[in-house]
Amino acid sequence: MNDLSFYFSAYILCYIWVISYYSITRSASDKAHLRLAAAKAVLRLTRQWDHKVPVDVFYLTLRISQDDFPQMRKLFLSKVHQYIKERALDAKYACAFLIGIDDYHTPQYEEFQHNLIEVSQICQQVKMRQLSVQADVNLLTAYPEYIIPYLVHVLAHDPSCPNIDKYEDVKAFAPIYWPLHLLLSTLLGEEGLQYSVPGMKKESFMTTLSIFRSIKCSKDAVDANKTKTLHAICDLGILIAKRLCPDQINVSENQTVPLPAQLYATVQNDQNENPV
């Protein structure tokens, strides 16, 4: 597929998205099927053109996991799981398993946790294979922890994200807390992978905190007004990580890591917030 073909396909997809949300001549079920068709088409396009998929289309695709029709959610998440397992889809799409979680007792919690463990295992396999071939190359994007910057940004831009300046009730932040907790517990908790390889827990903890610190030293490249929300989510993530790894709290985490340029822009040091 050349660039012209990609943009033609993207135009058709945008048209489908629009009519699936705003058409008044179609039933709700028809619109849901159109949204699913568009999302599945995006997943197929990303196999070769992931770097060309706009951020807003990426988010629209992920939010099929929040669709009002349970069957659409199930079909979409099944396809995401399949493509990631086949290594035909970037692990960042695992965010789709997370943004629909708003409580520990959500029926799909254990299923999504299992899916995330599989995604983490796939990332670890890719990382180890690449390290054995090119040990001097920065392979952070192959780390399962690299899902974090995408999840933080997705949560900050999700309609369910509360305004951090207006809400004082901790329950309002459940849509933020539980997705973060599920991902971090998969990476750092007892049900995760850190005990399978010596030193993995420490490495994962350091990488996790380095990612959060790097985000706190950045601004939102899509909407600068969301920067404060990004930083607040990172503060929450750091607290969760430290609670999951109390024996690692004193580990140094000064490493700066590169972040997805589509989502984050660097800021001057004097603009950085104080670390947690």
Spans of model-derived segments:
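Alpha-solenoid helical repeat scaffolds
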Residues: 1-87
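Long internal repeat-built scaffold domains in very large eukaryotic proteins
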Residues: 1-27, 110-276
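Residue-level signature of alpha-solenoid helical repeat scaffolds
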Residues: 37-44, 59, 78-82, 95, ...
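Small-side-chain structural scaffolding
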Residues: 38-41, 65, 100-101, 112, ...
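Short, highly charged low-complexity linear segments
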Residues: 72, 96-106, 137, 141-145
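C-terminal, active-site-flanking charged/polar segments
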Residues: 82-92, 98-124
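Juxtamembrane/interface motifs at transmembrane-helix termini
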Residues: 93-98, 129-133
